[in-house]
Design a protein with these regions (language model features):
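N-terminal pre-catalytic segment of deacetylase/amide-hydrolase enzymes
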Residues: 1-14, 159, 169
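Catalytic grooves of carbohydrate-active enzymes
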Residues: 7, 19-20, 98, 166-185
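Active-site-proximal N-terminal segment of extracellular/periplasmic enzymes that hydrolyze or transfer
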Residues: 7, 11-15, 23-34
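Active-site metal-binding loops of divalent metal-dependent hydrolases
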Residues: 16-19, 70
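Hydrophobic positions within alpha-helical membrane elements
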Residues: 22-23, 74
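Aromatic/hydrophobic pocket-lining residues that form the small-molecule binding cavity
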Residues: 23, 84, 88, 180-184
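Metal-dependent polysaccharide deacetylase catalytic core of the NodB/CE4 family, i.e.
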Residues: 31-117, 124-127, 133-151, 155-171
Length: 185
């Protein structure tokens, strides 16, 4: 059997994008309950009123992972090789300067990826990507469906929670919808 730190056989991974102000409340809930998550931030968008300033990342996300979400959040499969490399490398470099730790992971903006993006990201030191296939239509459809749905929206392996077979194409199992907090109460 595969075993995780502490002799655990199962793990829960949570991933949140964009470094928004709402993360403060979310991190507080996670910290009170001993839950850790990955927060995928955009170093080039921290001056927006809905985003957390980079100066708050170290304190807020302490005990959580910070991963990149590209510098300016473009739909990456619409970008050329140079822009893909620049978006990833600039975000990775900026974040590492702020948090003084290596950045290993990445979430693709709008879920849009392809083999070129995966290859460039790997060459730049990225160890995992969520998701790395073109899931944009799937995610958009799920979000539209969520308006009339109760509970989480399944995106990946709805019959189980297997370990990813390809960390550079880490498809999520489900996506939070607008009622998820209420369902958890």
């Amino acid at each position: 059997y595969k075993c995780f730190p502490g002799g655990k056989f199962k793990v829960l991974t949570l991933s949140y994008d964009d470094g928004k102000l709402e993360d403060k409340r979310l991190v507080d809930i996670f910290n009170k309950n001993g839950i850790r998550a990955t927060f995928n931030v955009n170093s080039g968008l921290t001056d927006m009123p809905i985003r957390l300033p980079a100066s708050e990342w170290n304190d807020l996300y302490d005990n959580h992972e910070i991963a990149l979400h590209t510098c300016t959040h473009p739909t990456m499969n619409r970008c050329g090789s140079y822009e893909i490399a620049r978006e990833i490398l600039e975000d990775k470099t900026n974040i590492e300067k702020i948090i003084h730790k290596p950045v290993r992971g990445m979430a693709l903006p709008n879920g849009a990826g392809n083999k070129l993006i995966t290859s460039i990201a790997a060459d730049l030191g990225i160890k995992y990507i969520r998701p790395a296939t073109d899931q944009y239509a799937v995610v958009k459809s799920a979000l539209e469906y969520a308006n009339d749905c109760e509970g989480p929206i399944l995106l990946g392996d709805e019959n189980g929670f297997s370990m990813p077979t390809d960390y550079m194409n880490w498809i999520p199992t489900c996506h939070h919808n607008h009622n998820l907090v209420e369902f958890g109460k």
